[in-house]
């Protein structure tokens, strides 16, 4: 079964998001783009809520969100029960997001991280497995 990915960004991450959609589709993933669809200014919560809702409902396996700092989309997504959105800025953090927190949304700071680094972080994340054990107990305390 193919991994399905929900992706979205505000205007600050629009250009990078387009590249990420192509990157993921070329790797064989099924991707749904929740917008935005231009560089016109939008409010990041409008996009982040859609992606997080789709993850919460288990319509997609992984979410990817971008905004200027990554903080806004991460905070918004984490308001949804069952969503574990991780702000990632390097490959090690992305790996740990999967291994230790079983994150289901990756959030990127579009103004501070290159699209090449985002691609590496997504690949690293998808190549990891959740370690369970003590981490599962900790996640239970969040839920």
Which residue stretches match the model-derived regions?
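SAM-dependent methyltransferases
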Residues: 1-4, 25-27, 51, 59-60
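Glycine-rich phosphate/diphosphate-binding loop of Rossmann-like nucleotide-binding domains
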Residues: 6-26
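C-terminal binding/interaction regions
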Residues: 6-8, 12, 91-143
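A general structural signal for well-ordered alpha-helical segments in protein cores
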Residues: 17, 44, 48, 70-74, ...
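Short, structured active-site "lid" loops
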Residues: 47-65, 69
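Mid-chain, well-packed structural core segment of small domains
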Residues: 65-107, 111
């Amino acid at each position: 079964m193919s991994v399905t990915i929900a992706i979205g960004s505000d205007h600050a991450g629009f250009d990078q998001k387009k590249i990420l959609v192509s990157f993921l589709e070329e790797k064989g993933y099924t991707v749904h783009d929740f917008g935005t669809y231009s560089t016109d200014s939008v409010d990041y919560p409008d996009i982040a809520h859609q992606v997080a809702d789709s993850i919460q409902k288990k319509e997609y396996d992984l979410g990817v969100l971008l905004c200027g700092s990554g903080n806004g989309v991460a905070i918004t997504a984490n308001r949804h029960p069952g969503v574990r959105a991780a702000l990632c800025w390097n490959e090690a953090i992305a790996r740990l997001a999967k291994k230790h927190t079983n994150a289901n949304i990756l959030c990127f700071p579009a103004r501070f991280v290159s699209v090449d680094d985002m691609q590496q972080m997504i690949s690293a994340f998808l190549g990891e497995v959740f370690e369970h054990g003590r981490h599962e107990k900790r996640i239970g305390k969040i839920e």
